């Protein structure tokens, strides 16, 4: 199983590299007048992304295979929303390759600039000298969702698990939380030195095909509600009533709290709580020790020696015409 997984990950990374090279050549470097109409929706062995500037009622007539009863899936991630932050276009329609989201990323410009600045020092044991072919990581002409998806994809395909990557990008308000465990604070402090928060009112749903989950921004400014039914269906949406659910079939319901995560792992066959997810991530490495050895606080730096001003400095300055 371990060998197969490594080979599968290599194959996924190879497809990622090919897609990035081809996309850059066509969308950014070619002279084609309609180059931005080209967009690779998924190129995945696990997921198929259906994309279109459609209303919900137009989806099934446009993609009739979705109505075929032999077409089965264990998850579906659906997005229906007007474009509010960018000019609407087919390639910007959601879902993206790994996520879809309700809200906006207010820190986008800073996030994009910092991702650009990191490229000069980027290195990878997985991509070696080919890593420059992945640049720019956050592609131009994307929406805030598309840029977030680009960076999330890089983190996942560089070896991080999906929940860890999402925690790095959408952290909790951890600095002054007296009830948060030290291990989790240590993780967030370590992660903050690698990746600044992608902040803003946002409810983000994410999947890699083996896990699907959701996270709410740390201010809790977007709703996310869920139902769990007695036939093992989980329905999460930005509001109640998106799908009809008989009340007597509901075994659990609730809403995401600010900064909290909701995750289903299909390999393990279970719904995993926020506490369990983050405890596992926070304890996978000695983050506290790494922080102690690598982070230098300003208050710990030695003070510069204090020197007294020469008593006749001011008269001399005036003598030389200083005012």
PLM region spans:
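Phosphate-interacting basic helix/loop segments used at nucleotide- and nucleic-acid interfaces
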Residues: 182-202
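Anion-coordinating catalytic cores for phosphoryl-, nucleotidyl-, and glycosidic chemistry
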Residues: 80, 87-88, 193-197, 216, ...
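Single conserved hydrophobic/aromatic residue that forms the stacking wall/gate
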Residues: 1-12
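Conserved catalytic alpha/beta cores of large enzymes that bind or transform nucleotide phosphates
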Residues: 106, 112-189, 240-323
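Amphipathic alpha-helical
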Residues: 36-66, 159-188
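Active-site-adjacent "gating/activation" loops or surface patches in catalytic cores
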Residues: 65-91
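Conserved catalytic micro-motifs used in adenylation/nucleotidyl-transfer and phosphoryl/amide-
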Residues: 76, 89-105, 109, 196-236
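Short, glycine-/Ser/Thr-/acidic-enriched flexible segments
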Residues: 55, 82-84, 104-106, 111-113, ...
């Amino acid at each position: 199983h371990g060998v197969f997984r490594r080979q599968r990950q290599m194959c996924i990374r190879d497809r990622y590299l090919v897609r990035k090279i081809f996309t850059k050549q066509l969308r950014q470097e070619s002279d084609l007048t309609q180059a931005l109409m080209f967009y690779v929706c998924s190129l995945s062995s696990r997921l198929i992304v259906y994309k279109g500037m459609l209303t919900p009622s137009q989806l099934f007539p446009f993609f009739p295979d979705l109505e075929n009863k032999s077409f089965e899936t264990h998850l579906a991630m659906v997005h229906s929303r007007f474009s509010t932050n960018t000019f609407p276009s087919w390639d910007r329609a959601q879902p993206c390759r790994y996520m879809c989201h309700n809200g906006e990323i207010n820190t986008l410009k800073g996030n994009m600039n910092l991702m650009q600045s990191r490229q000069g020092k980027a290195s990878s044991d997985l991509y070696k000298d080919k890593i420059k072919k992945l640049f720019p990581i956050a592609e131009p002409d994307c929406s805030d969702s598309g840029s977030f998806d680009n960076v999330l994809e890089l983190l996942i395909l560089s070896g991080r698990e999906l929940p860890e990557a999402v925690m790095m990008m959408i952290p909790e308000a951890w600095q002054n939380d007296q009830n948060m465990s030290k291990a989790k604070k240590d993780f967030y402090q370590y992660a903050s030195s690698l990746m600044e928060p992608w902040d803003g009112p946002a409810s983000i749903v994410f999947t890699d095909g083996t896990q699907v989950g959701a996270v709410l921004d740390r201010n809790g400014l977007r709703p996310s509600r869920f139902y769990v039914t007695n036939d093992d269906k989980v329905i999460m949406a930005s509001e109640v009533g998106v799908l009809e659910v008989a009340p007597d079939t509901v075994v659990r319901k609730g809403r995401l709290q600010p900064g909290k995560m909701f995750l289903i792992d299909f390999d393990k066959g279970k719904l995993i709580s926020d506490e369990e997810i983050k405890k596992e991530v926070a304890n996978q490495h000695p983050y506290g020790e790494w922080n102690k050895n690598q982070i230098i606080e300003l208050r710990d730096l030695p003070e510069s020696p204090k020197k007294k001003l020469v008593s006749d400095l001011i008269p001399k300055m005036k003598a030389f015409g200083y005012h």
